[in-house]
């Protein structure tokens, strides 16, 4: 007889957060425009613009929360965020970093001044 597998109860909702604090405060990122982009681009059952009552996208100051009643991948949210950054030519300055299990954060790339100076001397 095969050993029984422990079955995890299925999650009823998926909740993910995007922290946009630093770029929004610096004025290079528009959270309202990004929220609209997500509403247009998120696919439900293979169709865009089909959020219905299944996926809810909420913006509170500098944070965007995506709540889904169907399975929703955190990786898909990262993909859409990177797509938005590329579309608005922000991909060279910002990166998407997971700060915890349910949260992504937009951070600036860390460029050290020492590397730039040593390259210019050569």
From Swiss-Prot:
GO terms for biological process: cytoplasmic translation. This is Ribosomal protein eL22-like. It comes from Homo sapiens. The keyword Phosphoprotein applies. GO terms for cellular component: ribonucleoprotein complex; ribosome. Pfam families: Ribosomal_L22e. It comes from the Eukaryota. The keyword Ribonucleoprotein applies. GO terms for molecular function: RNA binding; structural constituent of ribosome. Belongs to the eukaryotic ribosomal protein eL22 family. Keywords: Phosphoprotein, Ribonucleoprotein, Ribosomal protein. The modification Phosphoserine is found at residues 112, 118, 120.
């Amino acid at each position: 007889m095969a050993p029984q597998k422990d079955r995890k109860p299925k999650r009823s909702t998926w909740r993910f957060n995007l922290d946009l604090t630093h770029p929004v405060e610096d004025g290079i990122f528009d959270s309202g425009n990004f929220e609209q982009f997500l509403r247009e681009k998120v696919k439900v059952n293979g169709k865009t613009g089909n959020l219905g009552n299944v996926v809810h996208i909420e913006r509170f100051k500098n944070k965007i929360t995506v709540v889904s009643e169907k399975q929703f991948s955190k990786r898909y949210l990262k993909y859409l965020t990177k797509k938005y950054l590329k579309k608005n030519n922000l991909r060279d300055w910002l990166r998407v970093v997971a700060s915890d299990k349910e949260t992504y954060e937009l951070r600036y790339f860390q460029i050290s001044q020492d590397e730039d100076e040593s390259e210019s001397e050569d």
